[in-house]
UniProtKB/Swiss-Prot annotation:
Pathway: Amino-acid degradation; L-histidine degradation into L-glutamate; N-formimidoyl-L-glutamate from L-histidine: step 3/3. It comes from the Bacteria. This is Imidazolonepropionase. Binds 1 zinc or iron ion per subunit. Its cofactor is Zn(2+); Fe(3+). 4-imidazolone-5-propanoate binds at R87, Y150, H183, E250, S327. InterPro entries: Amidohydro-rel, HutI, Metal-dep_hydrolase_composite, Metal_Hydrolase. N-formimidoyl-L-glutamate binds at Y150, N324, G326. Belongs to the metallo-dependent hydrolases superfamily. HutI family. Catalyzes the hydrolytic cleavage of the carbon-nitrogen bond in imidazolone-5-propanoate to yield N-formimidoyl-L-glutamate. It is the third step in the universal histidine degradation pathway. Keywords: Cytoplasm, Histidine metabolism, Hydrolase, Iron, Metal-binding, Zinc. It is found in: Cytoplasm.
Length: 423
């Protein structure tokens, strides 16, 4: 006896093809069962097939999906979830053409968020991040990577990681924690980046002991941390047992993509300025390219990451929101899917694979998230759409009808009681 049987599914997107990251033709392929059904028991998927094949199955609850699309829960592999305050006051300055460095000198930019995060209590940060997670869930996301990075000191970075750990216990969404202490160089360490990185490295053994982070990340960019500094820092983190990621080539082609491939990073993120050589090296590596077109869009930049070229050359591409208060204040991964289709020239099939299978592998969750397969946990989304391409095509709104997390009802459109969180 099943707990739940979803039937009369118009298109069941299983995403279940080869194991491992998807590249080239595999990214263009979307496994779809027309007129499908999914059976769930004890939070686990027990049946995947056609509605006709499911006719003999017994279930405590049978849900008629009315010919709509069902997919795996989406995976957002790059967010800056935990932070204090907001920065809407900077919009007018940006529109007036005030340079970012001048905004920084006025106490704005990342320094504003760092100060607000330092001042906020752990309880305040939990409440705020919970609000944002609820929104992510409403957009169909069931697994999220969450970074620290708005402390730039030991106490606040630790506080952010503890917030993620608490939310992992309390919120339906699965969280994957990343230590991004090397997000920027604080004023007091100006010209002394190596000393600052050593301070951050000194925190890692305790973070590892308390299991507060699975990944270590660094911002490799002009004026922040060099390629050599980034490689050395991440290799030392790997020696301590962490997997690593890198904010790479967001603005300039510094060689961050090449560095990620060389050191075996789980992902290289941003990559707007990635060189041809960097793309080639990523294609010949196991590193996932996590592209963040929502950030480029919000910053009103003309040049987007070369997603089309990356896919054609064999890079495993994932998509993420880069949710953060400065350069991409949105939890809407569906909007990111639309931007990727229009600006990165990705097909609807590639976009879907990039927010499920490949995004799961970008955070070492490829064996548990991003696919609908017998034996896996039942993270499922019912969409108010009768064709999968409709979701990125009709942009700017949420098409989610219902979300199940581990087989439990986690969100239903129109249920005003589903979220008690406030910002």
């Amino acid at each position: 006896m099943l707990d739940i049987l979803l039937t009369n599914i118009g298109q069941l997107l299983t995403m279940d093809q080869e194991d491992g990251v998807l590249r080239q033709e595999a990214m263009k392929t979307l496994p779809v069962i027309e007129s499908g059904a999914v059976g769930i028991k004890d939070g686990v998927i027990m049946f995947v097939g056609t509605a006709e094949e499911a006719k003999g199955l017994q279930a405590r609850e049978i849900i008629d999906c009315e010919g709509k699309v069902v997919s795996p829960g989406l995976v957002d592999p790059h967010t800056h979830l935990v932070f204090g305050g907001s920065r809407e006051n900077e919009i007018a300055l940006k529109l007036q053409g005030v340079p970012y460095l001048e905004i920084l000198e006025q106490g704005g930019g990342i320094l504003s968020t760092v100060n607000a995060t330092k001042k906020a209590s752990k309880e305040e940060l939990v409440k705020k991040a919970n609000f944002h997670l609820d929104r992510m869930l409403s957009f169909g996301v069931t697994t999220v990577e969450a970074k620290s990075g708005y402390g730039l000191d030991d106490e606040t970075e630790w506080k952010q990681l503890e917030v993620v750990a608490q939310l992992q216990k309390e919120h339906p969404i699965d969280l994957v924690s990343t230590f991004l202490g090397a997000h920027a160089v604080p004023k007091e360490y100006k010209g002394k980046s190596k000393e600052f990185l050593q301070w951050m490295l000194d925190l890692l053994p305790a973070i590892k002991e308390k299991e507060l982070a699975e990944f270590v990340d660094i911002f490799c960019e002009t004026g922040v941390f060099s390629v050599e500094e980034s490689k050395e820092f991440l290799l030392e983190a790997k020696e301590l047992g962490f997997d690593v990621k890198i904010h790479a080539d967001e603005i300039d082609p510094l060689g961050g993509a090449e560095a990620a491939a060389e050191i075996g990073a789980a992902s290289a993120d941003h990559l707007v300025g990635a060189s041809d050589k960097g793309i080639e090296m990523l294609a010949n590596s196991n590193t996932v390219a996590t592209l963040l077109p929502g950030t480029t869009f919000y910053l009103n930049k003309e040049s987007f990451a070369r997603g089309r070229k990356m896919i054609d050359e064999g890079v495993a591409v994932a998509l993420a929101t880069d949710f953060n208060p400065g350069s991409c204040p949105t939890e809407n991964i569906q909007l990111v899917m639309s931007i990727a289709m229009l600006k990165l020239k990705m097909t609807p099939e590639e976009v879907w694979n990039a927010v499920t299978v490949n995004s799961a592998y970008a955070i070492n969750r490829g064996d548990v998230a991003g696919k609908i397969r017998v034996g896996r946990k039942a993270d499922l989304v019912l969409w108010d759409a009768h064709h999968y391409a409709y979701v990125p095509y009709h942009y700017g709104v949420s098409h989610v009808n219902t979300v199940w997390k581990n087989g439990n009802l986690a969100y239903t459109r129109g249920d005003k009681a589903w979220s008690k969180a406030t910002i």
